[in-house]
């Protein structure tokens, strides 16, 4: 028998004490004081306290993280079987053994004996049936392997020893998955956590597809432990015969992508969790083109990780290994030169006349964005000093995400104070940019789709654009595409995620590309890298605002002009977060509901022209878990699980010549999605 049964039995007994005492009071009170029958007294008791017992044992005794509905049904079945077995069999037996005793004494004795038998059967049933799924029993074995490993330091073993059962379960019930976005998770000890051991596993898996003699560039952002994790990755690669080129300072994603191409590396690594909560970190991997890994390569790395003989004993080199080198300033200088080429020619007086407030949100973009704007002639730039320090706790925000307007509260105050024209902000790894515009005395924030549409219009206007290509994703709004068409620019759509946009770029000549962008605030206005770039996007944002200011317009004025020309667009995204194993099951259930109900989901709201199921390869896009509801008026809604966070995302793109009608349809779609998710 598994040795952990003793610990579980002890916790079961402890959580059961209160239930048992309360149950005895209810049962004997109903029987002896209120005169209820034997069966009524015992049934009321166990029905009431079983509900509490389920949640206590689920959380405390067994640390179970599976679906509530399934385990709840098993729990009810278990209670019924235990009750009938304990009390149905116990009463006749006690009545026979105590035949000469008074009836009341015999029935009290039968209830007491039944309770003892019920408790024992209930524990066994819960352990092996209710909460006994294999994945929830295996985590203990993995945990104990870590505790007993000679490769862990004593301080780490002490941390493991202090974990609660629930913490152990969540940290060890699965391995962090490795996909095309790499690996991302909460930092801490365990297979389901980001730590030096899981970093080593990922690095070893990557080394396995490269081979000896390969060359890999490694960057890291300002998140806690990012620099340590980067060095761990370098040590593993070096020990595997791979040359590791490491930055000696915080470096943004676009710089890493550029470096891979500039130094002709075989791949790249960035230690970052982008704009996730402070508790997270991640391991992003790039191919030789500076693009995030494709599905086939990611699958090979995942397979290599699964096949590791000793996950905790992966060989590492010393930090002074000759296979570890540091990247020089010359690479950074070439990157900064390349960023300038992503912009357009604007009058010097236009740049100096624009007032900009910039926040790096404690991330790696600070020096790069400031220097980029300085080189382009933007001399009136105010840095948000409260958010300028490198700090992985991101103390001034809940989440360092420039998609969320709440992070700009300090920047907005400064903008109003000095009368700034625009606010810009980059996330910790500086691949995304968010922006707000001073319009009629207040800051109006641009959505990712609106910024992309403005970029398309500006770049197409300022460059020779006819015949070029705009690359975007299947869940990005249509406004940019419609604007592009008016300039003779073709739009190519790929699966969501910039790796797919960048891979599409690789299929065309660089002079054929106008730009690439997606709705999640990621833009690439040049061809110097193969990932989104918050640094060059900051430059183009400021050049665009400066250009239109010279014409007497804000970017909001320009947006309204585009609405008047192309129609009114509302783009919205709804995200629903579901943590842990139970959350993953819930997300799967939601997608199943929308997929199975299909055409009926929005039938009473808007006529459905087509349901595109990308799991079947719709639009020629590689198979993906995405649904897109195409409506007859040109609007659409889409659903997909996030690839990097425990959430399911819904997208709405509504377009209509009548703004009021567009807003009405948006409200109806949003309410329907929320209702369907709640019921799934």
Where do the model's predicted regions map?
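Alpha-helical membrane-protein topology signature
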Residues: 1-136
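Phosphate-binding and adjacent anionic-ligand microenvironments
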Residues: 420-422, 462, 466-640, 647-651, ...
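Gly/Ser/Thr-enriched, mixed-charge loops and adjacent short helices
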Residues: 167-172, 176, 281-407, 415
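Conserved phosphate/anionic-ligand binding catalytic regions in large, soluble enzymes, centered on
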Residues: 172-192, 274, 356, 360-372, ...
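Short beta-alpha connecting loops at secondary-structure transitions
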Residues: 282-293, 321-324, 392-400, 435-444, ...
